[in-house]
Regions:
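A general structural signal for short secondary-structure junctions and capping/turn motifs
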Residues: 68-71, 93-98, 119-121, 169, ...
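Class II aminoacyl-tRNA synthetase-like tRNA-binding/catalytic domains
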Residues: 2-120, 128-132
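N-terminal pre-domains immediately preceding structured catalytic cores
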Residues: 52-57, 61, 171-179, 321
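A translation/RNA-centric and nucleic-acid-associated enzymatic feature enriched
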Residues: 110, 180-345
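Extended, charged alpha-beta segments that form solvent-exposed binding/catalytic grooves
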Residues: 105-193
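Generic structural hydrophobic/aromatic packing signal, biased to beta-strands
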Residues: 24-26, 30-34, 68, 80, ...
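Generic recognition of stable, solvent-exposed alpha-helical segments in well-folded globular domains
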Residues: 21, 25, 29, 138-145, ...
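A generic secondary-structure signal for well-formed alpha-helical elements
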Residues: 34-41, 150-161, 310
Length: 345
């Protein structure tokens, strides 16, 4: 609630019915284009996993997964996924995909410890994708090439939506700007990571921040990253400036995945070297899993961005604090109030 933004004179251009149609338009166009450009095949994915496998995403290391016991299996624990970052790499091998081929899936997750605001919800929906690469592709040039491909899909989607809806103006720049987290800290040494993201994104329009997770010269990382999927030297976030809320909006987090050397190093840095003995992590060390690149792209985030919405609750159904509902009820338009209240009826 403390980070809730109530933009002045905000008015949703679409009612509830038309918003649902527009959401489908965004999702259908973008995912088809992404699959074509990255050579991805859609697959089904799990909602929950066995915690003993090490397949769940540990995010920043402190978020609690939703856990439940399975009656038929003597109350054996299962965890609702935080993301499918690790599962996808395992699936590529299991399903027999080859170099240059990949998968994408609709990922639904519950993040119970999320602090909600205009762009954060306890319900997370994203396209999770993963692609097999050659070992020699594990470099910044290949990462940048893939980022440019994803960004072109975002620009094409904005252009398509601007044709469908006359209130949508084109705001994404032609090219995305690349910068490492250390270079960004050097530019704004006296600011927080979030402030740095805001300043660079407002200046450039669309930014790819690379090399996130390791400690910077200041002694702090730009942001937290789990140590066992992204290689911290070869990952990236795609952010765009969003004028509706005057913020830097992250649309995608992606990266080239860890090899044996990066995994062992990052587990040691994160203070959890024992995780190398879990089945997933062990398969990386043993070299039985393919080299991959992958990421997640927020479905509600891009719908919110392309439809110029002020709150993620306008494009997804979730649960919100009562004070959030009350604050929006008196400031933001009627449609927004109704949608936030759907789950209280």
């Amino acid at each position: 609630m403390e980070n809730l933004i109530l933009p002045k004179q905000y008015k949703s251009e679409l009612n509830l019915h038309d918003t649902q149609l527009a959401i489908k338009t965004v999702k259908d166009f973008f995912q088809a284009l992404l699959a074509q450009r990255l050579h991805l095949t859609r697959v089904s994915a799990p909602l929950f996993v066995d915690p003993a496998t090490g397949l769940n995403d540990n995010l920043n290391g402190y978020e609690r997964p939703v856990t439940f016991g399975i009656k038929e299996q003597d109350d054996k624990n299962a965890e609702v996924v935080h993301s499918l970052a690790k599962w996808k790499r395992y699936a590529l091998k299991k399903y027999g995909f080859q170099v240059g081929e990949g998968i994408y899936t609709d990922m639904n997750a519950i993040r119970r410890d999320e602090s909600t605001d205009n762009i954060h919800s306890i319900f997370v929906d994203q396209w999770d994708w993963e692609k097999i690469i050659h070992k020699e592709d594990r470099n910044l040039d290949y990462l940048k090439e893939t980022v440019r491909t994803v960004y072109k899909c975002l620009r094409k989607t904005e252009q398509y939506m601007a044709i469908q809806y006359d209130y949508i103006d084109l705001i994404l720049p032609k090219e995305i700007f690349f910068i490492t987290s250390q270079e960004l800290e050097d530019l704004f040494p006296d600011n927080t990571p979030k402030e740095r993201e805001y300043y660079i994104t407002k200046a450039k329009g669309a930014v790819c921040i690379m090399q996130i997770g390791d400690t910077l010269e200041s002694g702090e990382p730009h942001d937290g990253r789990a140590p066992d999927y992204d290689d911290w030297a070869l990952n990236a976030d795609i952010l765009v400036y969003y004028p509706v809320l005057d913020i830097a909006l992250e649309l995608s987090s992606m990266g080239i995945r860890v090899d044996k050397t990066a995994l062992i190093s990052q587990l040691d840095k994160a203070g959890c070297p024992e995780r190398k003995d879990l089945p997933f992590q062990k398969s990386i060390i043993d070299g039985t899993l393919p080299y991959t690149i992958g990421g997640g792209i927020g479905q509600s985030r891009i719908c919110m961005f392309f439809l110029r919405k002020a709150h993620i609750g306008e494009v997804q159904s979730s649960l919100w604090p009562e004070e959030t509902i009350a604050a929006c009820d008196s400031v933001i338009c009627f449609f927004f109030r109704r949608l936030l209240k759907l789950n209280t009826i």
